[in-house]
Every structure is written in structure tokens, then in C-alpha cells.
């Protein structure tokens, strides 16, 4: 097994496909995806284009359709929900399909959708993701951060490091053999430095500060928790994620 960490979708190499690819957007798309599926949502369907989302969701039964739209940390006008995991209660999302478009997370999922296995990961479901990968033993694993509009993000990197660290311990493979690139080693080092205080790291991150300015303090606390959800969001067909 080789693990490659890519800080943003733009860094994913062209012309090659990983056996297993993981999209990470801790603040907040993949955290919200995991939370919604754990709460009983039927599926999450992701879009980069809002007009396409609206057109596709219009074909779905209204009572089982939830439009999730976020731009710049705020709910898109006319949508049912923004990108907060706290909106994803069982009462609200059970048996529903969430049609989702966010600033960053949907881009990373679309960038890796041709991989054999595509997973959405966050800190909240880190161990479920790591256990699945350890069981499946894919030859190549990509962990792709969403970043912020093409730039690096601390929160996605530390989550990538958390997943890689779990696999490092589970497999017993030496780090120099498990890591496919320097970014993997750096991500693990970041996680080791902050694993006892992940909330502090998220509060220092530029997107964390952006959300704090929008009074999303509780979202940051929730998103900084590790291994609280035993759910594995897996791509069923391009752009559609279900609980495995």
C-alpha cells in the first residue's frame, strides 16, 4: 500500500487513477456528508453547478429532496440548508436525498470520481475510513484535501494525516515505505503535533477563522472531534454517495 496526500484537487496528477481515493473537506462538506448519512439520509448527490443541482433535484419527489447550497460559508438563497452538520438531524434528513453544492468539497469529490473506490472522509469518521482501507488493502490510496478556492488548508491536511497515521499503526509498514509523497509525511507530522488539540488548529486555520466570523463556533467544535461516527460514505455512482 502507498498513500499519497494531495493538499487540493488541483494537485491531483492527470492521466492516472488511484485504486482508492478519499475526499476531505473537514470545514464542512465531508463532515456534513458523514453526519447526514449517519442520520439516515438516503444519499448525497454532489454538484459544482447550482443550476444543474436545481434542475436535477426538481425531478425528485419534493418530500424526499433537500437542497444544500453553500458559498463563502453562507447558505445559498432559496436552498433548504447550508453546510452545517447541525442541520442534518434524523428528523430532517432521514430517507431524503441531499442535493449538495459547496465552495470546495464538491470539487474534490468530482476530481476523484473516476477512482475504483471513492470515499468522503472527515475527522468525525476517520476510524471508519481507516478500517475500511485496512480491510480492503488497496495498492494506491489518494487522500485529497479540498482546500479553499485552490489554496492549502490546515484542517484538511491534519485529517489526511489522521487517516494516514491510523493506517501506519494498523499496517505496521514503515513510514518511508507507506508514504508515496512528502505531503503524506508532512500531514502525519501535523496530526501528531495537534492530535490532542485539534480544535485549536481549526480555530487557527484561515477557513476556521472565516467560519468563526460567521458565528459558527459550534460547527468548529463538532468538526474537530475524531471518530464519533461509524459511517463510511462511498460513491455508488459518479457524484452519488451512500452509506456503505
Swiss-Prot record:
Which Gene Ontology MF annotations are present?
2-phosphosulfolactate phosphatase activity; magnesium ion binding; sulfopyruvate decarboxylase activity
Q: Which family does it belong to?
A: Belongs to the ComB family.
What gene is it encoded by?
comB
| Superkingdom, taxonomy of origin | Bacteria
Q: What is this protein called?
A: Probable 2-phosphosulfolactate phosphatase
Query: InterPro entries, from UniProt?
Result: ComB-like, ComB-like_sf
Which Enzyme Commission number(s) are listed?
3.1.3.71
Q: Which HAMAP family match?
A: ComB
Listed Pfam families: 2-ph_phosp
Task: Tell me which UniProt keywords the record has, alphabetically.
Answer: Hydrolase, Magnesium
What is the organism lineage in this UniProt record?
Bacteria, Bacillati, Cyanobacteriota, Cyanophyceae, Gomontiellales
**Cofactors required:** Mg(2+)
Q: Which reaction does it catalyse?
A: (2R)-O-phospho-3-sulfolactate + H2O = (2R)-3-sulfolactate + phosphate
Amino acid at each position: 500500500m502507498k498513500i499519497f496526500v494531495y493538499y487540493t484537487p488541483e494537485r491531483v496528477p492527470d492521466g492516472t487513477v488511484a485504486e482508492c481515493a478519499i475526499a476531505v473537506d473537514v470545514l464542512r462538506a465531508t463532515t456534513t456528508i458523514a453526519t447526514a448519512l449517519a442520520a439516515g439520509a438516503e444519499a448525497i448527490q454532489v454538484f459544482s453547478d447550482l443550476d444543474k443541482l436545481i434542475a436535477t433535484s426538481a425531478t425528485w419527489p419534493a418530500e424526499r429532496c433537500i437542497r444544500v447550497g453553500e458559498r463563502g460559508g453562507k447558505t445559498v438563497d432559496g436552498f433548504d440548508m447550508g453546510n452545517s452538520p447541525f442541520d442534518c438531524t434524523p428528523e430532517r434528513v432521514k430517507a431524503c436525498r441531499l442535493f449538495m453544492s459547496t465552495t470546495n468539497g464538491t470539487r474534490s469529490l468530482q476530481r476523484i470520481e473516476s477512482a475504483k473506490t471513492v470515499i468522503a472522509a472527515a475527522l468525525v469518521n476517520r476510524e471508519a475510513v481507516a478500517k475500511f482501507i485496512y480491510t480492503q488493502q488497496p495498492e494506491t490510496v489518494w487522500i485529497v484535501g479540498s482546500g479553499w478556492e485552490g489554496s492549502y488548508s490546515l484542517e484538511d491536511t491534519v485529517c489526511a494525516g489522521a487517516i494516514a497515521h491510523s493506517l501506519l499503526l494498523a499496517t505496521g509498514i514503515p513510514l518511508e515505505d507507506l508514504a508515496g509523497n512528502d505531503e503524506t509525511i508532512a500531514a502525519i507530522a501535523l496530526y501528531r503535533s495537534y492530535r490532542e488539540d485539534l480544535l485549536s488548529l481549526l480555530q487557527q486555520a484561515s477557513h476556521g477563522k472565516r467560519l468563526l466570523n460567521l458565528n459558527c463556533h459550534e460547527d468548529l467544535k463538532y468538526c474537530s472531534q475524531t471518530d464519533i461516527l461509524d459511517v463510511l460514505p462511498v460513491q455508488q455512482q459518479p457524484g452519488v454517495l451512500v452509506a456503505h
